[in-house]
Amino acid sequence: MGAVDNTAIQRLLHPRSIAILGASDNPIKLSGRPIELMKRFGYTGRLLPINARRSEVQGLPAFRSLDDIDGDIDLAMVMLPADKVVDGVRDCAKRGVPAAIVGASGFAEVGGRGEALQQQLQDVIAETGIRVLGPNCLGMFSLRDRALPTFTSAMDDGGELREGPVSFVSQSGAFGTFIFSAAQAAGLGISHFLNTGNEADLSVAEVLGGLVETDETKVLMAYLEGVHHGRELLQVARRAHELDKPILAVKVGRSEAGARAAQSHTASLAGEDAVFDGATRQHGIVRLDGMEQLLDAGLVFADGRRTRGRRLSTLSLSGGAGVLMADQASSNGLQVQPWDEAWQRRMAEVIPPFGSPRNPVDLTATLISDPGMLRRALEITVEHPGTDMIAVLLGNSDNASGPLIDAIEQAYRSTDRPLVVVWTGGSGRPRRRLQDLGIPCFTDPGRAAAALGKLADFSLRPPLPAAERPDDIDDQVVRGILRDARQQGRVQLNEYESSRLIAAYGVPCSGAFPADDPDAAVAAARDLGGPVAVKLLSDHIGHKSDIGGVRLGLTGDETIRTAAAELLDIAREAGDPAARLLVQRMAGGDTELIVGIKRDPAFGPVVVVGFGGVLVEVLADSQVGVAPLDAAASKRLLTSLRGSRLFGEVRGKPARDLDAAADVVARLSWLAHDLADDIAELDVNPLLLDQVGKGVVAVDCLAVLTKPEA
């Protein structure tokens, strides 16, 4: 991502003048559609067709070149064939145009010559400083200004454009506009839409960074196929967090097939999905699984309301719908609690005796003949101190919809708590009226519950990590270990060096001594005392247990001497006659974790935690965080593991020392951050947890170095 030039991005978002290079007089052609759309919807700025063969385009004066235009040009849309795009963008930069949109395909997404062409485009961008959206994109639209430099068909339905507080960025052009159209149909108003295409210059992260600063944007939505600039995206997330503007994101490529398709479609590298998932959760980005969830969340976030808690009160015409809502709400992390008796008595005064004043409140079908009941019930619900969110479940009832909607609107305007309506069946007219009033409306209780669950997660999100580097790190030891390994031309540290490295960062390690031969191993065991482990210590063999290179719980001189000799024989057979031995004190603790660090191509150094030992791949229970982390964020990673109940008291076993484990995770995250240029991967496996107060100990560690630059 280039250096942020917010002025250029703002002129892209709010262009007062737009030049169309290669503008066609034919409004049906792709190169003619931008002018037709902006004329139809009333663009308020200057529209400047560039066509060397015509004096007029679609009734507008045409210009032979950019140089023939007087005054500033905020934005150019380059509607030229791919082989003419580079010259066109260069002309724009020469003319002083700050931003351009490139619609043509045939660049990096097709490989070969297209990649070379995209590199030429990037060279021009680097030389001139012009900002470019695309190539291989269908443009953008700003509904506030009716600026529509796009050739989309999303506006061909003849309807009005619904402007609103949501701005949407999509790496996919066509599918992005499908989502835009669905949002409009669902009553979700959009302020800006931008398609980033191949991201030769402007990335999703940078576009979101520009949008988050606009007053008209209260909610950001993103459809992602890959993330090139993960750290920049997280910087935007931090800014959005400060402004209380949610980022709602759908990222495809969870499966290998999806990742391959995403890469071939937009020439983007789909990073490891688990890293994206952990990074976005850590920074408050709301990740959603598809278009339906994205739009549903958009509806409940768009009015800017937040919830103080997870307690949902439901009023339902149907008892069955209320039960379904309660189930779905619970599945999405919400609480549906019966009201206390005093409040139930108040509700019982306004509903039939055969209804239920508990929560969910069953208003019964009497509501159809007495729609005023809903107003009275909602007044009580709004006053109820144990209600954080409100859901009203209705269905059919077209003839009674007027007073019902009036009651809902009155309640909605009288409270700042989130209030949603589920209106199932009927003609759809009640839902459209609610949409026009700005009240979130759904057809399915489950979808409403899922959206409210996401709203609660965001509203109650923890603070972003504010990690402070520990002041007891021994940087001199760290530099010495790395210097020695580099001078020897090695690609990994052996276990002893790796353990010394993490110990320099304050990670407790099991006592150990290296030994050159069986006699030295016996002497080391005597010094350590108690049962010991004897392991191969090799600069070349990484996973010792795979070749039988570990002996555990050894006592007695002869037992240790025999085991040591056998291990050296194994090393010779494995091709490392220079291998040594590591004699290590057996450690306490019976809960095994793995804590690893790695460098992600998009997000940089990350930390991976999970339940470990030799079954780490089988258990596949892990969480990812972006380094550096503080202790609180590290603890949240650990408690997010599926097996996190093992940290508590289980069948008489005392609780594990979770705080000590979190401290180790935080310290290793600083190692990942500090040594990102030196350490490609590092695994502590296992990290043994003892009971509360007895701490943790790292038993085995392996660090892989980055390849030296040529």
Give the residues covered by each predicted segment.
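Catalytic-core regions of core metabolic enzymes
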Residues: 1-710
